[in-house]
């Protein structure tokens, strides 16, 4: 597998921020600004039809967690994804057709906008995933569209018609063109695809491969794509063909077998960003045991990940995974097991643990979340240190 260099300004910005912490030759103890991860936020789906979606923030410094329902109003019914831009967390509320704006420091609701009012009833219903690029936000809707949202005016400036039931999205491209890649899940009906949007011209084309039937998340390195696909279900609801696929020029190769969620972190060699480490877990419907894997896009190697040291807070029903973009530490969220039934309880608050990149539980990092933790993100801040 070719070892492609990153060629997007977004990737290089991340590389420069990280390497500035590593390659400091200052010997006079002059205070320097460095970027650190200050915490993690978790979007909790809440209980179906109870309107109790919430946000949990885990503060690294105090190792304490706060879960908020935004003054009682909550994040609606089934918040599904979130993206941090500046000091605002933009949360997509799938059932409510909303994008909620939350202040990342006070965890209070700033504002909200209706995606159906912005885009139309049929185009804007059920927003699913959101990302940011060049100070704009991009979100998918089950109406089959991607909306481009101006965070200052809260208006949709462009909308792009993509495939059926779009989910995750990611930016990639070449030295001359920036593309937005979109997972079209087809709602699990088996005719999934990837849409490629040229951000300069607005043109859209479709990438299809028979192996990729139900794409959910996507990671891009240039035009190399790594797609988390949920495959399909047989008549007994066994999940078949789920995994992580490498897609290039229309081909698709499974690099991780059996995976239901994933997150990534940039790999650095000699201070240069060279690829991703993609960490996955597999816990399909009906499972009793989760498995974890790591795939290195630079070497093309897959390895297993074994969690350890967490016997007091064992992850038994994983629901989300996030990888700290600076340290590579891993946060895994879990549903709580009902002691009477022995099964995951979808009505109780969940919890999360932090692990080193090698899978060792980090003492003091167990914390409670809201009901059904679903999406994990991280907050980065600049701080002044002396060397």
Residue positions per predicted region:
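Bacterial Sec-dependent N-terminal signal peptides
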Residues: 1-41
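A short beta-strand motif characteristic of beta-propeller blades
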Residues: 22, 63-74, 108-121, 155-160, ...
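Short coil/turn segments that connect the beta-strands within blades of beta-propeller domains
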Residues: 36-40, 86-88, 134-136, 174-178, ...
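Conserved beta-strand positions in repeat-built beta-propeller and related beta-rich domains
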Residues: 42-50, 91-95, 138-143, 180-189, ...
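Blade-loop segments of beta-propeller domains
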Residues: 67-131
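Intrinsically disordered, low-complexity segments enriched in Gly and acidic/Ser/Thr residues
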Residues: 256-348, 354
């Amino acid at each position: 597998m070719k070892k492609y260099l990153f060629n997007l300004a977004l990737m290089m910005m991340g590389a420069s921020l990280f390497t500035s912490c590593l390659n400091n030759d200052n010997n006079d103890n002059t205070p320097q600004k460095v970027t650190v991860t200050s915490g993690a936020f978790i979007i909790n789906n809440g209980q179906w039809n109870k309107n109790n979606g919430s946000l949990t923030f885990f503060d690294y410094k105090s190792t304490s967690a706060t879960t908020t329902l935004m003054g009682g109003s909550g994040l609606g019914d089934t918040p599904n994804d979130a993206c941090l831009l500046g000091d605002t967390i933009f949360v997509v509320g799938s059932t409510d057709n909303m994008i909620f704006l939350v202040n990342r420091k006070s965890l209070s609701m700033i504002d909200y906008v209706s995606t159906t009012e912005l885009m139309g009833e049929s185009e804007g219903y059920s927003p699913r995933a959101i990302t940011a690029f060049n100070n704009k936000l991009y979100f998918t809707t089950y109406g089959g569209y991607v909306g481009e949202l101006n965070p200052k005016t809260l208006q949709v400036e462009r909308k792009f018609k993509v495939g059926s039931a779009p989910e995750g999205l990611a930016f990639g491209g070449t030295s001359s063109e920036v593309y937005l890649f979109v997972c079209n899940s087809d709602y699990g009906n088996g005719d999934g695809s990837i849409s490629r949007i040229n951000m300069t011209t607005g043109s859209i084309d479709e990438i299809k491969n028979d192996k990729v039937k139900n794409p959910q998340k996507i990671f891009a390195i240039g035009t190399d794509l790594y797609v988390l696909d949920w495959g399909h279900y047989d008549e007994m609801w066994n999940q078949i063909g789920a995994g992580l696929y490498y897609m290039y020029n229309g081909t698709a190769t499974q690099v991780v077998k059996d995976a239901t969620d994933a997150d990534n972190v940039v790999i650095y060699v000699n201070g240069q960003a060279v690829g991703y480490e993609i960490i996955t877990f597999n816990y399909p419907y009906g499972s009793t045991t989760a498995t974890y894997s790591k795939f290195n896009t630079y070497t093309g190697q897959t390895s297993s990940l074994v969690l350890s040291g967490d016997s007091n807070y064992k992850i038994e029903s994983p629901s989300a995974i996030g990888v700290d973009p600076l340290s590579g530490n891993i946060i895994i969220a879990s549903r709580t097991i009902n002691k009477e039934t022995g099964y995951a309880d979808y009505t109780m608050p969940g919890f999360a643990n932090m692990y080193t990149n090698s899978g060792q539980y980090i003492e003091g990092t167990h914390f409670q979340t809201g009901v059904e933790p679903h999406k994990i993100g991280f907050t980065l801040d600049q701080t002044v240190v002396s060397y």
